[in-house]
């Protein structure tokens, strides 16, 4: 089956044909690093990491770029509130981001460009737009002349006139038209800034991604992706900037993941109902959170609650049990061949079902259903009096194959010594801070992994329990 994906630009599923055969250039909008990421930030990280993994599974060479916005209004506000420098805060939360998404099974992008490290390219991009008549300077600010770009609105499927009716010029803005948007902001007093032809300032949000995508991936890319909330105005404005500058299509396919609701309400900071990944993975297996995110098609909204996550944990546990039973039975299996072709055919059918699911716009929900079907077949097979080693190996291999694409593992994780030492140090720190709930949670976590702790006057000792 041919891989098809839903393109927001055309509002339909299309066969995937990359610009260059066998290669995929992919850009995913990353976070603004002023705090720990919430589960709304985690969803695109997980979803598009899975898209990347499946493209690689199909044999494509994927060049994957995802940025960090490490200077903007939110970071400046956080810096003022905390009495710290913007780069210090950005660095702290970039480190935290890698820790969080790493625990969720996300592979690092080939490149994670930062706005502050690409300022020359951003300034050059803006100057070229001015030279071409698509932008103008006004008292140190630079604005994009939206009506000058003929295709504006093609991603969000809105006409300029429709957009104009809701547009307003805010106090302090010097734009000529309410539809125009900021490319460069003149610096305020005591605010982080960079020199430019228009005076000291910093870039607007939209220009950053256009400039960095072009620098690291070229004028035209295959896939541009992000959350549904970015389609307008962010991605719409990226198209206007990039295509005005190059005269070429910016991205062939636009992918957007759906919203996350918390207990059936849309997640928002105004409602105070956002949940940090940092907090969830203190109490829940990060793999379960990833499994939960992929259990719904990426374009559909997903409802999060602790109860639903617990249900997911139980479902994930059933798969781990089936996998564990296969590994255990492997030790007593023989070279039996009678009836094995029938079981091998069933396994191959499940492989094809997985590929069919993923070829249909990366339908991870259906792919996970295939895992449960595979587990059901495995459980039936294990009821046989005699089992063949190569059949069990085939079951295990397909489980591993599917899970490697979906980004989790059914294997029991054995902690490395350094990981154990790090957990013990976190527990000791919690005890020093009289955070006994965290201390007990880490002890229980280690106990579940067969690690036995002994607290002594000289410190905490540990050993692995008997298998």
Curated annotation (Swiss-Prot):
A motif ('KMSKS' region) lies at residues 266-270. GO terms for molecular function: ATP binding; cysteine-tRNA ligase activity; zinc ion binding. It holds the Pfam family CysS_C. It is found in: Cytoplasm. InterPro entries: Cys-tRNA-ligase (IPR015803), Cys-tRNA-synt_Ia_DALR (IPR015273), Cys-tRNA/MSH_ligase (IPR024909), CysS_C (IPR056411), Rossmann-like_a/b/a_fold (IPR014729), tRNA-synt_1_cat_dom (IPR032678), tRNAsynth_Ia_anticodon-bd (IPR009080). One of its GO terms (cellular component) is cytosol. Keywords: Aminoacyl-tRNA synthetase, ATP-binding, Cytoplasm, Ligase, Metal-binding, Nucleotide-binding, Phosphoprotein, Protein biosynthesis, Zinc. Binds 1 zinc ion per subunit. One of its GO terms (biological process) is cysteinyl-tRNA aminoacylation. Its EC number is 6.1.1.16. Its cofactor is Zn(2+). It catalyses: tRNA(Cys) + L-cysteine + ATP = L-cysteinyl-tRNA(Cys) + AMP + diphosphate. The keyword Cytoplasm applies. CDD domains: CysRS_core. Zn(2+) binds at residues 29, 209, 234, 238. Belongs to the class-I aminoacyl-tRNA synthetase family. PANTHER family: CYSTEINE--TRNA LIGASE, CYTOPLASMIC (PTHR10890:SF3), CYSTEINYL-TRNA SYNTHETASE (PTHR10890). Monomer. This is Cysteine--tRNA ligase. It comes from Bacillus licheniformis (strain ATCC 14580 / DSM 13 / JCM 2505 / CCUG 7422 / NBRC 12200 / NCIMB 9375 / NCTC 10341 / NRRL NRS-1264 / Gibson 46).
